[in-house]
């Protein structure tokens, strides 16, 4: 790991297997510095959990990666493209390869489950035939064991089912990278573990890379190939979950005790 940047680093520097490269990113709002020389790389088929307290800048980091916010300085490469420099059309092409699971699920209450899942297909791939769209929707729902909900409304579903539907929609375009924003927040422990297992199952099936933003320690333990601790705007430490558990660093122990 590496902390401050100390050492239990796992050697994840920039290389040909990097799908996301974040280098020396700085972002502030007024006088509030949120990201302060933050650097992190994500490799192919790797789950990296970014751990931090509420308000630490985790969601700001995600928004910078997908181009919703522009960093004040630094570089964010996704699939070899520097996101802050992309125009709208090129940024949209990048986003078509990225799945995003929102903390609040972001399903449309006025749409059926089918219509919610069709939405990203219509937005990014308008040349899909209806037969192809139907097949992708069914596959996505079968992935989360909810094919029977296809014509139901969101209000008819439990919180855990809504999260699984949101995950199905995230995966429907078979993205290369998935960004998860607090995927288990508000769920009971059993349902949260089911979501963790689905994340791992679908990553293995579709060979995706992912960044998981969370402060749920069970989610960290269950899903992380590598953990990055966001503290004071920096990547304070990164390494394996077991390295964090065994660390005597006081800033790390507050999360893992």
What are these regions (language model features)?
Residues 189-191:
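Helix N-cap at the start of a conserved alpha-helix in ABC-type nucleotide-binding domains
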Residues 172-176:
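A short, proline-enriched helix->beta-strand linker immediately N-terminal to the Walker B motif
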Residues 178-181:
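Catalytic Walker B motif of ABC-type/P-loop ATPase nucleotide-binding domains
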Residues 130-148:
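Conserved ABC ATPase "signature" region
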Residues 66:
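Helix-to-loop junction immediately C-terminal to a conserved catalytic motif
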């Amino acid at each position: 790991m590496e902390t401050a940047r100390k050492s239990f680093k796992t050697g994840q520097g920039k290389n040909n297997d990097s799908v996301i490269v974040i280098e020396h990113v700085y972002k502030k709002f007024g006088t509030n510095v949120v990201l302060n020389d933050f650097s992190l790389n994500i490799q192919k088929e790797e789950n990296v959990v970014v751990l931090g307290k509420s308000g630490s800048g985790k969601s700001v980091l995600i928004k910078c990666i997908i181009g919703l916010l522009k960093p004040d300085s630094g570089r964010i490469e996704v699939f070899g493209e520097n996101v802050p420099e992309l125009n709208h059309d090129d940024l949209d092409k990048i986003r078509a390869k990225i799945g995003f699971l929102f903390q609040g699920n972001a399903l449309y209450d006025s749409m059926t489950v089918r219509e919610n899942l069709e939405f990203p297909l219509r937005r990014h791939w308008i040349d899909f035939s209806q037969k192809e769209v139907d097949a992708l929707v069914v596959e996505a729902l079968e992935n989360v064991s909810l094919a029977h909900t296809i014509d139901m409304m969101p209000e008819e579903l439990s919180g855990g089912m809504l999260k699984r539907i949101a995950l199905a929609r995230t995966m429907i375009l078979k993205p290369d990278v998935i960004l998860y924003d607090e995927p288990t927040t508000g769920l009971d422990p059993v349902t949260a573990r089911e979501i963790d297992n689905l994340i791992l199952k679908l990553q293995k099936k579709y060979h995706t890379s992912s960044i998981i933003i969370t402060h749920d320690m069970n989610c960290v333990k269950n899903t992380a190939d590598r953990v990055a601790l966001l503290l004071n705007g920096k990547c304070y430490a990164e390494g394996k979950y077991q390295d964090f558990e065994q660390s005597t660093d006081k800033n790390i122990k507050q999360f893992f005790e």
